[in-house]
């Protein structure tokens, strides 16, 4: 399933489920561009991180936006014990070595989130920088919401960091509400953020907007 839409000034966008075969590298690059600052201490350098992410994607745990056949955005989600980004502890140690890999595993553990029964957890949205603010994120969120409904989930949950107010504003427009903020000042110097807000949206609800503003 998927959707077609026309974004302001960008032409026809197609939203599809799953990562197309052969597009793993492109997805990893977009993901790293969006989340590299946060994930950098665990996966740097970029020339090692991007191939690692690409090699360990669960390609059925994403919805992608395409423009003229090229992926310009994606949203990952976690359900049924699997998320978009994978990679076992053994894979991390193979890629980075045992000495340097152990502390990376500890950092990656900070980002682990498990859905409660009836929840689908979103792993964040990554959009091509040239197309941000043109409706791509809204289309991706609504497709994830459709996935959640089909899986009989009651709600969608996500976390947003305090240094990404634009993403939080988008989530609020699409019907998410903040339920808890965890202040983590001890992580600011290491990961670049000092608070994480958990947001939820009931499945079957949303906003009346069709596009990002």
Predicted features, each with a name:
Residues 41-68, 72-82, 111:
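Active-site rim helix/loop that mediates acceptor-substrate recognition in acyltransferases
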Residues 63, 75, 120, 125, ...:
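Conserved GNAT-family N-acetyltransferase fold
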């Amino acid at each position: 399933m998927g959707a077609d839409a026309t974004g302001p000034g960008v032409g026809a966008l197609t939203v599809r489920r799953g990562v197309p075969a052969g597009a793993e590298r492109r997805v990893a690059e977009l993901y790293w561009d969006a989340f590299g600052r946060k994930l950098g201490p665990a996966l740097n350098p970029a020339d090692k991180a991007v191939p690692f992410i690409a090699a360990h994607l669960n390609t059925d745990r994403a919805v992608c936006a395409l423009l003229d056949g090229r992926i310009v955005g994606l949203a990952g989600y976690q359900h049924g014990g699997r998320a978009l980004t994978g990679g076992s502890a053994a894979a991390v140690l193979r890629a980075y070595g045992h000495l340097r890999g152990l502390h990376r595993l500890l950092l990656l553990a900070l980002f682990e989130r498990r859905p409660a029964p009836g929840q689908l957890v979103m792993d964040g949205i990554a959009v091509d920088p040239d197309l941000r603010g043109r409706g791509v994120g809204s289309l991706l969120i609504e497709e994830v919401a459709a996935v959640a409904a089909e899986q009989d989930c009651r709600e969608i949950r996500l976390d947003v960091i305090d240094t990404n107010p634009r993403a939080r504003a988008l989530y609020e427009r699409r019907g998410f509400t903040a339920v808890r903020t965890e202040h983590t000042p001890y992580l600011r110097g290491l990961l670049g953020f000092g608070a994480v807000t958990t947001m939820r949206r009931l499945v079957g609800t949303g906003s009346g907007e069709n596009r990002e503003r």
